[in-house]
């Protein structure tokens, strides 16, 4: 019988970012209690040798599973020492992978208080609205002018420590495109 390969999208992440993610998840599960219903699985609770941890986030009948890996092949940079993250959507036997932005939006919708586009209409009609958004990572696009006015009126509180963001976890801070400096500021262009 031939080997059967499965392809997974694994985001390369440095070790310190994964450690920060794990700490934030545990803090908000056990101390602040903002991550109610989440479950954390340690590496020794998994049968797969490369799984470092799993965070199971229930969304009604669906489950979001964020898995961190170690011992993968080294990445293209020396700080990518074989660490990675996958984000999976599970519903019964159906499984698919989703991107970090969508994961943050789903977590935001199900777990954290927020005033959204419906709040604009409620505010105009004079109804009482939720005063602020607790999970800013869930807003990945610029809102309407009314929404921006509401956010300017009611500034979001900074939570210490911040809520765990999947997008922040997989963000690539080293491979951002280099900005070229002007002729005067570039040493290589001047030949000095």
Swiss-Prot record:
Locus of motif HCCH motif: 108-139
Described function: Counteracts the innate antiviral activity of host APOBEC3F and APOBEC3G by promoting their ubiquitination and degradation. Acts as a substrate recognition component of an E3 ubiquitin-protein ligase complex: mechanistically, Vif hijacks a host cullin-5-RING E3 ubiquitin-protein ligase complex (ECS complex) and the transcription coactivator CBFB/CBF-beta to form an active E3 ubiquitin-protein ligase complex that targets APOBEC3G and APOBEC3F for polyubiquitination, leading to their degradation by the proteasome.
HAMAP family tied to this protein: HIV_VIF
Annotated protein name in UniProt: Virion infectivity factor
Localisation: Host cytoplasm; Host cell membrane; Virion
Note: Vif-defective viruses show catastrophic failure in reverse transcription due to APOBEC-induced mutations that initiate a DNA base repair pathway and compromise the structural integrity of the ssDNA. In the absence of Vif, the virion is morphologically abnormal. HIV-1 lineages are divided in three main groups, M (for Major), O (for Outlier), and N (for New, or Non-M, Non-O). The vast majority of strains found worldwide belong to the group M. Group O seems to be endemic to and largely confined to Cameroon and neighboring countries in West Central Africa, where these viruses represent a small minority of HIV-1 strains. The group N is represented by a limited number of isolates from Cameroonian persons. The group M is further subdivided in 9 clades or subtypes (A to D, F to H, J and K).
Region (Interaction with host APOBEC3F): 14-17, 74-79
Site (Cleavage in virion (by viral protease)) residue list: 150-151
UniProt domain comment: The BC-like-box motif mediates the interaction with elongin BC complex.
Organism: Human immunodeficiency virus type 1 group M subtype F1 (isolate VI850)
